[in-house]
Swiss-Prot record:
Listed EC numbers: 3.1.-.-
Cofactor note: Binds 2 manganese ions per subunit.
Name listed for the protein in its UniProt record: Metallophosphoesterase 1 homolog
Residues passing through the membrane, by range: 7-27, 328-348
Length: 370
């Protein structure tokens, strides 16, 4: 029975390590990047940015796949939030895999699972951006999908958030089609309003800015689901896509016109996006740093990651934090299984040797009696 006990201990240790400890061990290698300029160093904003968790719905994927991958996303996020204690968390779209396919009741269950998985302590905002799997691509967008996303997750087509004097503009990429549709017109109007708000922050003494709430001006940071226009990941200074594919405007990335419009109206200093499921750091069409954030889910990325950004009104530093790779967990369980087989094989060998010795002794006794 000792070998069964040994196998039980081996499997239990592998289980506890992989399911409860490994995330902390891997994530401890990450640290908040440090701002070198001294003006705002005492109180920078620390933002954790992730993308594309793709929580499975009732139609796609096996229930066991959904259970296990979502368990690991929960463990990874809770480990990260405890270790890093961010000031704000942004999720850059495709929160759900079937958000544009489910009924209102199923969507409510989706939101409940999402908020449970990405639960944060009081006082830390979770800002969720709409993705094409949440409300549909432009051709599929419907007031019903849009209104329920806005209602449950408190985010409309375009929003301006100001946290610690840092301005974030959150955009619904699917409303950047520029074809004059209801959603596009509404989004463009909201962008123009935000542009005026930012202008009044910069020039508060202008006559048209008399009634505007006054915040110190700094160039905004752009957050959306689609990256701004680029031909492919060949334009990235660094990336982790396993292969390069050409991007289509309005499907993989924003169009040139939409990208230029955002640059003209907002004049951002930094941009973050998701959608491609792979990491990319590029200097985009607007001449600013853009980070495409890899998927947070093992279902889309076997080596997922997220971003840690330290930001002040006049500076920023961004670093990539690698999460627990799926292959590491599989290899750990495989190693535990092989170790168990070795223990069992060793025990069987001992049993066989013991029986042979016992048989030899019995044979000698029989010969002695004869």
């Amino acid at each position: 029975m000792r070998f069964l006990y040994a196998c039980f201990v081996i499997v239990l240790c592998a289980l506890i390590f992989c399911e409860y400890v490994a995330d902390f061990v891997v994530l401890q290698k990450c640290k908040w990047p440090e701002i070198k300029r001294k003006k705002y160093v005492d109180d920078p904003l620390r933002a954790m940015i992730l993308a594309d968790p793709h929580l499975l719905g009732p139609h796609r994927g096996h229930w066991l796949d959904k259970l296990y991958r979502e368990w690991h996303m929960t463990r990874a996020f809770q480990a990260a939030s405890r270790l890093f204690q961010p000031d704000v968390v942004f999720v850059l779209g495709d929160l759900f895999d079937e958000g544009d396919m489910v009924s209102d009741k199923q969507f409510q269950e989706y939101v409940w699972r999402y908020l449970k998985m990405f639960h944060l302590p009081p006082g830390i905002p979770l800002i969720s951006v709409a993705g094409n799997h949440d409300v549909g691509f432009h051709y599929k967008m419907h007031p019903f999908f849009m209104s329920r996303f806005e209602s449950y997750l408190n985010n409309s087509s375009v929003n301006l958030y100001t946290i610690k004097q840092i301005h974030f503009v959150v955009i619904n990429s699917m409303a950047m089609e520029g074809d004059g549709c209801m959603f596009c017109t509404q989004a463009e109007d909201q962008l123009k309003n935000i542009s005026r708000t930012l202008y009044c922050m910069k020039y508060p003494l202008e006559a048209e800015c008399a009634r505007t709430r006054r915040h110190p001006y700094s160039q905004p940071i752009l957050l959306q689901h689609f990256p701004t226009y680029r031909i492919s990941d060949t334009m990235c200074e660094e990336h982790d896509a396993p292969y390069i594919e050409a991007f289509r405007e309005r499907f993989h990335v924003l169009s040139k016109d939409a990208t230029d419009m955002l640059g003209e109206l907002l004049k951002p200093r930094l941009a973050f996006a998701g959608h491609s499921h792979h990491f990319c750091h590029s200097v985009n069409r607007l001449g600013i740093d853009e980070y495409t954030v890899a998927s947070f889910s093992w279902r889309n990325k076997v080596n997922p990651s997220f971003m840690l950004a330290t930001i002040t009104p006049d500076d920023y530093v961004v670093s990539k934090c690698k999460m627990l790779p799926q292959q590491f967990v599989f290899n750990s369980y495989l190693s535990a299984g092989i170790l168990c087989l070795i223990v069992i094989g060793f025990q069987l060998r001992k049993c066989i040797q013991s029986r042979r010795q016992s048989s030899a002794v019995d044979h000698r006794k029989v010969n002695y009696l004869d």
